[in-house]
Amino acid sequence: MQNQLIRLTYASTATFKTDIKGGIESEVARILLQSRRNNSRIAVGGVLHYGDGYFFQCLEGDESAVKSTLQRISQDQRHRDVQILLNVQIQRRLFEDWSMKYST
């Protein structure tokens, strides 16, 4: 049985210093690579924005998968002060084809 689909957005503070190379911060590039690999396995999608030392992310998918993803993010040393901004049930996804889109 599949859980309910949800959309969850959060904001957090980055704990690393900005080091931009090739148009994207190197630590953010590592986060994106890991997120895309992990999210495609568990059918979680969304979009990540990073700017001025802050993350804003929207995650969509099966409720248990999204919540376990948020738990991993909350325990990730690169994030602090994780604040949930939205957590709602949805009928369909906006980001179904994006394992993790990046926005600047």
What are these language model-derived features?
Residues M1-T104:
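Charge-rich, low-complexity N-terminal segments
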